[in-house]
């Protein structure tokens, strides 16, 4: 059995190589900060379930990601956040969606898992449960930032569900032939969704994912993030957190398929993750992070980029956005 491993993501999508430093660096610093928190927690023997909740809570508190405080707006200018969490050892899980006042959706998902006979609570029922549990809530206006209002305005003007990085607020240079081979920016990428997967030295696994969804989404739209087996999954073999176009992730049951290929086909983590991302989902739509019980890490994506970070007990660590050779 290998030692502990951890991986986290800050979303996959159409991230141009020309992304300005003022947009790139805060996300990289956020990933670095949260990775360190996760590493220290694993070193101190915290269970992976606690680790992934802790890391995703921290990611939700960083406005540069599309989760928690940074959540994007619906077509009515409101926030509807969603999250899920799963423990690989027990297969217990919890999920929430339609949240507009809960500061840290991932912790409410954990409470659904721990304190109710259910797996999934949504909208008013979830918010009532949050009040019952004494979860920290704020006025919904807390989540309405100037940047997200502007992003929604651009999306409405363009009559599209999402404005991607390449169209947001700065000039985009003409593409050369190499760039034209990359997945096209189609406005459907799910920018900034956050997730974390972890395994301890005993092979215990957990996964957590949180998001604000898609810019200009219809009120009531639910994506892959709170759906166990789509955006989040963990069992005794692996833990997976997905990001990208939610509808593509749902229809391909991305997270569960990685585990199923390992279980029923005997594929390695990397083989299973690569197959799901590159063979079973449309180009330009999906990325994921995954760890195995043996401590392996996989972080494939078929978008132009994915904000990601990882570390292992043997000292390896990585923070990256675009493909690495």
From Swiss-Prot:
| Name of the top EC class for this enzyme | hydrolase
Question: Reaction(s) catalyzed by this protein?
Answer: Cleavage of a beta-linked Asp residue from the N-terminus of a polypeptide
Q: What does the PTM comment of the record read? A: Cleaved into an alpha and beta chain by autocatalysis; this activates the enzyme. The N-terminal residue of the beta subunit is responsible for the nucleophile hydrolase activity.
- Hydrolase among the record's keywords? yes
Residue positions annotated to bind substrate are 221-224, 243-246
Which GO MF terms does the UniProt record name? asparaginase activity; beta-aspartyl-peptidase activity
Q: What EC number is given for this enzyme?
A: 3.4.19.5
The record's active-site residues are: 193 (nucleophile)
Instruction: Provide the GO biological process annotations.
Output: proteolysis
Per the UniProt record, one Pfam family is Asparaginase_2
Keywords from UniProt, A to Z, are: Autocatalytic cleavage, Hydrolase, Protease
Top-rank taxon, per record:
Eukaryota
Q: How does it assemble?
A: Heterotetramer of two alpha and two beta chains arranged as a dimer of alpha/beta heterodimers.
Name the protein family: Belongs to the Ntn-hydrolase family.
Summarizing the function annotation, the protein's role is: Acts in asparagine catabolism but also in the final steps of protein degradation via hydrolysis of a range of isoaspartyl dipeptides.
Q: What is this protein called?
A: Isoaspartyl peptidase/L-asparaginase
Q: Give the organism, scientific name.
A: Lupinus angustifolius
Q: What is the lineage of its organism?
A: Eukaryota, Viridiplantae, Streptophyta, Embryophyta, Tracheophyta
């Amino acid at each position: 059995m290998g030692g502990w491993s951890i991986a986290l993501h800050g979303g996959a999508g159409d991230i141009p190589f020309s992304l300005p430093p003022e947009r790139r660096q805060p996300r990289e610093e956020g990933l670095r900060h949260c990775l360190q928190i996760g590493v220290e927690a694993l070193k101190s023997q915290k269970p992976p379930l606690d680790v992934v909740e802790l890391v995703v809570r921290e990611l939700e508190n960083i406005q540069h990601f599309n989760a928690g405080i940074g959540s994007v707006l619906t077509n009515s200018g409101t926030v509807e956040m969603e999250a899920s969490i799963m423990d690989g050892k027990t297969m217990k899980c919890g999920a929430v969606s339609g949240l507009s006042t809960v500061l840290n959706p991932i912790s409410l998902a954990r409470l659904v898992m721990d304190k109710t006979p259910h797996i999934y609570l949504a909208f008013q029922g979830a918010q009532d449960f949050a009040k019952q549990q004494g979860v920290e809530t704020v006025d919904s206006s807390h989540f309405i930032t100037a940047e997200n209002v502007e992003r929604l305005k651009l999306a409405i003007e363009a009559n599209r569900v999402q404005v991607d990085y390449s169209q947001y607020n700065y000039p985009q240079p003409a593409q050369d032939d190499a760039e034209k081979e990359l997945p096209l920016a189609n406005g459907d990428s799910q920018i900034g969704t956050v997730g974390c997967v972890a395994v301890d030295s005993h092979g215990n696994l957990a996964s957590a994912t949180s998001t604000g969804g898609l810019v200009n989404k219809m009120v009531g739209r639910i994506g892959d993030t709170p759906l166990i087996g789509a955006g989040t999954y963990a069992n005794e073999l692996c833990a997976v957190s997905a990001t990208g176009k939610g509808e593509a992730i749902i229809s391909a049951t991305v997270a569960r398929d990685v585990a199923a290929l390992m279980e029923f086909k005997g594929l390695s983590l990397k083989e299973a993750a690569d197959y799901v991302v590159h063979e079973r989902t449309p180009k330009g739509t999906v990325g994921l992070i995954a760890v195995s019980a043996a401590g392996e890490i996989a972080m494939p994506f078929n978008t132009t980029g994915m904000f990601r970070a990882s570390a292992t007990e043997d000292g390896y660590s990585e923070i990256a956005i675009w493909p690495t050779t």
